[in-house]
Amino acid sequence: MAFVVIPSVDVVEGKCVQLVEGDPERRTFESDDPVETAHQWSEFFPWIHVVDVDAARGEGDNSDIIGRICEEVDAKVQVGGGIRSAERAEELIELGADRLIVGTVAFTDKDDFSKIVDVCHDHGIEVFVALDVNENHEVLVSGWKEDAGVTLEDAIERFNEVADGYLTTAVHVEGKEMGIDEKVVEKSTGATDLPVLYAGGIASIKDVKRAKEAGAYGVVIGTALYHGDIDPVALLDLMEED
């Protein structure tokens, strides 16, 4: 499986933002047009990662923007944030999502999560489980506001039979450009044969290479791209090495 780099388009109140530790009040980047932002990234990358931050926190819904990105942008789109029912999964699939990232409900309601997986697989859509972890590598849910009561490795063991992959985010370095938590990557890839995407703290090409060497299927990058600290062309070269 070829290594992938996926730019993140995080949506809060209809705007594309970059946040520190997922906090909507701590913004390091803001744009009024998430669709145009996604379009710009699609010129370099085959996938776009769209997060409905409002939905993840139970504070809103940005379905219209998600739908426009899926329809207007020439890239595959993986969507996360607030997917807590089969009905919501169905809506996002109908909007054009190519992969869903599911977090909270996977830990809080086994039956609802199973229904989401069934709906996705019926449509040929992959489900990646979101593993958002703190500095102790414990999983957080509900927009990173609550402890799920399970460690990273135990969570992976729980979902290996039903998930298609994982998106592991090191929340404690998210948006800070202070380097990746390499142990998070190693623990994730060491606990599963499924593809693992990593996010959090990426500040340089070196960080991306470290994640790749640790076994990640790919990385999701936000802040470093938006701040111009990583050249998209260099990332293209890295992906093409495979």
UniProtKB/Swiss-Prot annotation:
Top-level EC class as recorded in UniProt: isomerase
The enzyme's E.C. designation: 5.3.1.16
Top-level taxon: Archaea
Active site: 10 (proton acceptor), 132 (proton donor)
GO MF annotations in UniProt: 1-(5-phosphoribosyl)-5-[(5-phosphoribosylamino)methylideneamino]imidazole-4-carboxamide isomerase activity
Subcellular localization: Cytoplasm
CDD domains named in the record: HisA
One of the Pfam families matching this protein, by short name: His_biosynth
Pathway: Amino-acid biosynthesis; L-histidine biosynthesis; L-histidine from 5-phospho-alpha-D-ribose 1-diphosphate: step 4/9
UniProtKB keywords: Amino-acid biosynthesis, Cytoplasm, Histidine biosynthesis, Isomerase
Gene Ontology BP term (one): L-tryptophan biosynthetic process
An example Gene Ontology CC term for this record: cytoplasm
Reaction(s) catalysed by this chain's protein: 1-(5-phospho-beta-D-ribosyl)-5-[(5-phospho-beta-D-ribosylamino)methylideneamino]imidazole-4-carboxamide = 5-[(5-phospho-1-deoxy-D-ribulos-1-ylimino)methylamino]-1-(5-phospho-beta-D-ribosyl)imidazole-4-carboxamide
Similarity section: Belongs to the HisA/HisF family.
Name of protein: 1-(5-phosphoribosyl)-5-[(5-phosphoribosylamino)methylideneamino] imidazole-4-carboxamide isomerase
Source organism (scientific name): Methanopyrus kandleri (strain AV19 / DSM 6324 / JCM 9639 / NBRC 100938)
